[in-house]
From Swiss-Prot:
This is Protein HIRA. It is found in: Nucleus. One of its GO terms (biological process) is chromatin remodeling. It holds the Pfam family HIRA_B. The gene is hira-1. The lineage of its organism: Eukaryota, Metazoa, Ecdysozoa, Nematoda, Chromadorea. SUPFAM superfamilies: WD40 repeat-like. One of its GO terms (cellular component) is HIR complex. WD repeats lie at residues 14-58, 72-111, 131-170, 174-213, 222-261, 277-320, 325-362. Required for replication-independent chromatin assembly and for the periodic repression of histone gene transcription during the cell cycle. Residues 439-468 have a biased composition (Basic and acidic residues). SMART domains: WD40 (SM00320). Residues 480-492 have a biased composition (Polar residues). Transmembrane segments: none annotated. Belongs to the WD repeat HIR1 family.
Length: 935
């Protein structure tokens, strides 16, 4: 046991008050405790520096702070937890409230809020949640940071919207006992709750319904605990719940996921178990037979004042047990890497240091992400942190870098977070530049004032004149003030003419490919004559407006360009839509009706569709639709401008009024598509606002989109329809998504789009890509990320770009393949297996590209397929491609590309890669074509 030792940081405590909960910051640099202050009924929450606790040398260093922040509450605090991004923490108290605090930076002056200790960090109370009527016993953040759950003695669980506190998502009321413990599934599908040590419930996060209740392990439990801490295994396969009893012996029950079996357990303590906490990631252990196995390492605490460390499955005894480590009940655990922090009701904290030789090697975040993806087709956000970033987050504690470390510890789960983070970074840089400029000006003024004062004092010393008889005579000397006269300063400044600084202009960026999460199909079809005329009219109006602005702007003033007129806004990727399978159908949730909506018109700069669902006119409340264009309004002279600001004028191009609300909008340069609350899809001409058609759907629309003259709609019943608005015909009619969904696995819809011809392209969270064969009237699976992906080499981005040259010319299928996560080839796979699987995948992708009709996608897939066949020496398949491209009676073009040109490209590559094969098959194909043409 030399590799395991226990330390007792004496400086960590609540002045002999009880410590009821402990949690480690995601960065591993600090941890938080909560409980009761000594000899009072007040609560105490303290943020501690983790390095003095984990390192003895830094514990003795006086320059290393130990207490970072503390706050005293009016009542006892029972539970505290950090948010996944590490920027906030929440704690629940006996006064029925949940308090949320946010990190705002470091402080210079030493002090604390309602306390006497010295704080190093500054936190502000951003929200107090008062939804409960009795004591709050547990609080937990969801792994993705989207929800905050709290459980109370009032028999209720409240789910809050963590991104918009204090907004509630739902209240779970169907509970008969106090809620003593909560735990979120790391995959994000379930919330587990333990009620009065008598019943365990599993709540589905997509419907907030109880999907399973477990009571058998707790039927004979008569020794209830004050607080209960349950936890999931890192891979989400097991829920570890304390307070279970079997044959009168206390134990930890392991509830298996999906099957909900509870036949496995961890036993050995003499009194009731109170808490359990698993290591953040699985460990790899060497078995006696030489094999390596991935196991869960967990700590168990009990009322017998002891701690046991377990690895499972496959073990019957704990790895080791530390008896009587505390003087009272073990209340909670927190893992900081391989170090276990434990707190007790006796008011102390113990640290158990575990070496790799004892518990095994902890696997990487990337390996955990791949493991969860193989099991659930989902990559949890908590495992998306790379090993390099994790190592950086575990670096030594530095006060100057504390703020940045908190920011770096956060993860991004949605595009809105990316935009907010970028805005904050730009604002921080601008504020730092302004502060630096001001400080330099202040320093220069201060130095100038000091020099003037020094000169004045020297002149005053010269006033005293000592005569020969010893008498002193003071001579008058003029002494001016050390600061300039305000009137003089103003007048002097008024005479100077200061040239305004040159305006900063944003450069016109070239067209960029679709960003992560987008399925933006390329514009490859030609427009009609009327479309060209309307585009020309809009361009002329833009040119005239620019000319008018140039006339009004003085030549000596440099005007900044409006950002709306400079660049096309990037499309935001859609949020994943959860799919619920029920009785052979897929059910989805339509977006909530909003009072107002705004949607940018694709390929139209500064043009937006504005929706007002509560527009009142003549005493009637209806829905107003307006197409507006935002223009820059420039003042004719500088006196009309305030602080150099430029006003934006909204020009209404057309307006329409509807009797039903609009819940979702999509628009491009041709059509405006509105998904309405009366189950209709209404289409308007973008140019003039003419109502084209109103299409009746089978249920409310969940997703809609438009690409060129093609539109699609996905409804609540999971049925997809697409239309070619240019030809006025349906392409796909109410086709169910259930045929594409695997009901046995957790799945969600990542993206959906439609090609210019009306062929859909949908992507699921398990990596599967589907399109629709209109001729065969059936879904076609283009690619799937399953076990076959481990049997072949992945398609690299370089291979996908070599045919097109640049990313800008890539089609929607190629862009999707570039964004997909590449799977590593399993070791020991035979070359012939790699070749067979690779060719089969490319054949599927080639067929998908042909159905979509995009020329860039088809050419890329064709040339990549030919290159792969040349590398494998597949002579018969190469000959089949040439026969297909040169067969008589076939259309002259495929996906808008001439067959003869494709034939020449394929022939050229075969001659380059396999000259011998080219000499045999090219001549044979040419002879066959000549023979067929004679008849």
């Amino acid at each position: 046991m030399g590799d395991v030792y226990v330390t007792s940081p004496t400086f960590v405590g609540h002045d002999t008050g009880s410590i009821l909960a402990i949690d480690c910051h995601p960065s591993g640099k600090k941890f938080i405790t909560c409980g009761q202050k000594a000899r009072t009924s007040n609560g105490l929450v303290v943020v501690w520096n983790a390095e003095p606790v984990l390192d003895k040398k830094k514990a003795s260093n006086e320059n290393v702070p130990k207490l970072l922040f503390q706050v005293e509450s009016q009542s006892q605090s029972n539970s505290c937890r950090w948010s996944p991004d590490g920027k906030r923490f929440a704690f629940g108290s006996d006064d029925s409230s949940v308090s949320v605090w946010e990190y705002v930076g470091l402080i210079n002056s030493m002090g604390s809020i309602t306390g006497g200790a010295q704080n190093v960090e500054r936190y502000k109370e951003c929200c107090v949640l008062r939804g409960h009527s009795m004591e709050v016993l547990t609080v937990e953040w969801s792994p993705n940071g989207k929800y905050l759950a709290s459980g109370s003695i009032d028999y209720r669980i409240i789910i809050y919207n963590a991104r918009k506190l204090p907004d509630r998502i739902t209240v779970l009321n169907d509970i008969q006992l106090p809620v003593k413990g909560l735990s979120w599934d790391p995959i994000g599908k379930y919330l587990a709750s333990l009620e009065g040590d008598k019943k365990l419930r599993f709540w589905a996060t997509d419907s907030w319904q109880c999907v399973k209740s477990v009571t058998e392990p707790f039927e004979s439990n008569i020794e209830e605990t004050m607080l209960t801490r349950l936890d999931w295994s890192p891979d989400g396969k097991y829920l570890m719940t304390p307070a279970a009893v079997r044959s009168g012996k206390p134990l930890i029950k392991l509830i298996q996921r999906q099957t909900w079996k509870s036949d496995q357990f961890l036993a050995g303590h003499h009194k009731g178990t109170t808490c359990v906490r698993a290591m953040p990631r699985l460990i790899e252990a060497n078995l006696k037979n030489g094999k390596r196995m991935q196991l869960t390492c967990a700590a168990v605490g009990s009322r017998d004042k002891s701690i046991s460390i377990w690895v499972f499955p496959g073990t019957l005894k704990p790895l080791f047990v530390i008896n009587n480590i505390f003087n009272h009940t073990v209340m909670d655990f927190a893992w900081c890497g391989r170090n276990l922090l434990a707190c007790s009701q006796d008011g102390t904290v113990k640290v158990i240091h575990l070496s790799e030789s004892v518990i095994g090697e902890m696997i990487s975040n990337e390996a955990m992400s791949d493991l969860c993806y193989q099991i659930y087709s989902i990559r949890p956000p908590r495992y998306e942190l790379t090993d390099k970033e994790e190592d950086e987050s575990q670096d030594s504690f530095n006060l100057s870098d504390l703020s940045s470390s908190a920011n770096n510890a956060s993860f991004v789960t949605c595009p809105e977070d990316v935009l907010i983070k970028r805005k904050k970074l730009v604002a921080a840089q601008q504020s730092s530049d302004i502060q630096l400029t001001k400080s330099m000006e202040d320093n220069s003024k201060e130095n100038e004032s000091k020099n003037s004062e020094k000169t004045m004092m020297e002149e005053r010393n010269k006033q005293i004149d000592v005569r020969k008889d010893g008498k002193r005579r003071i001579q008058p000397v003029f002494c001016g003030t050390t600061t300039a006269d305000p009137m003089t300063s103003l007048s002097s400044e008024g005479k100077k003419t200061v040239a305004p600084p040159p305006a900063k202009r944003k450069a016109l960026a070239p067209a960029v490919p679709a960003k992560k999460g987008e399925v933006d199909l390329e514009d490859s079809s030609d427009s009609d004559d009327d479309d060209e005329e309307e585009e020309e009219d809009m361009e002329i109006s833009d040119i005239e407006s620019v000319r008018n602005k140039k006339r009004k702007v003085p030549a000596t003033t440099s005007q900044p360009m409006l950002a709306l007129d400079l660049k096309k806004p990037a499309l935001r990727p859609m949020e994943p839509k959860s799919l619920k399978t029920q009785e052979g159908t897929v059910l989805m949730e339509a977006p909530e009706q909003q009072p107002k909506l705004s949607q940018h018109v694709v390929d139209r700069k500064g043009m937006f569709v504005e929706i007002d669902n509560r527009w009142k006119h003549g005493g009637v409340e209806t829905t107003q639709i307006k197409l507006i264009k935002k223009k820059q309004q420039t003042a004719e002279n500088e006196d009309d401008m305030m602080d150099g600001e430029r006003r934006v004028n909204h020009e209404c191009l057309w307006m329409a009024v509807l009797g039903s609300p609009v819940i979702i909008v999509a628009a491009n340069k041709h059509n405006v598509v509105l998904g309405c609350g009366d189950k209709c899809l209404r289409v308007y001409r973008t140019f003039c606002g003419t109502h084209i058609v109103s299409l009746r759907l089978d249920s409310l629309p969940v997703l809609i989109g438009v690409t060129e003259h093609a539109a699609y709609a996905l409804t609540e019943n999971g049925r997809l329809s697409t239309w070619n608005l240019k030809l006025g015909k349906a392409v796909v009619t109410r086709q169910p998504l259930f045929d594409c969904v695997e009901a046995s696995t957790d799945n969600s819809l990542i993206s959906a789009d439609v090609s210019e011809t009306g062929v859909p392209l949908i992507v699921f969270s398990n990596g599967s890509i589907f399109t629709f064969n209109v001729s065969l009237s059936c879904w076609i699976q283009a690619i799937t990320t399953n076990v076959l992906g481990r049997l072949t080499s992945p398609i690299s981005d370089a291979q996908l770009s070599c045919s097109n040259g640049t990313t800008n010319s890539a089609g929607p299928l190629v862009r999707l393949l570039k964004r997909m996560r590449k799977q590593a080839t399993a070791p020991g796979v035979a070359p012939q297996v790699v070749k067979a699987v690779k060719e089969s995948q490319l054949e599927q992708l080639l067929h998908c590209a042909e159905q979509l009709g995009n020329p860039q996608d088809y050419q890329t897939m064709l040339m990549l397929y030919v290159e792969t066949l040349c590398e494998g020496g597949s002579e018969k398949k190469l000959k089949n491609i040439l026969n297909d491209l040169s067969r008589s009676g076939a259309p002259m073009q495929v996906c808008g590309l001439r067959r003869s040109a494709l034939y020449d490209d394929v022939t050229r590559m075969i001659k380059l890669k396999q000259p011998a094969i080219a000499a045999r098959i090219v001549a044979g194909v040419a002879a066959s074509t000549t023979t067929k043409s004679l008849f």
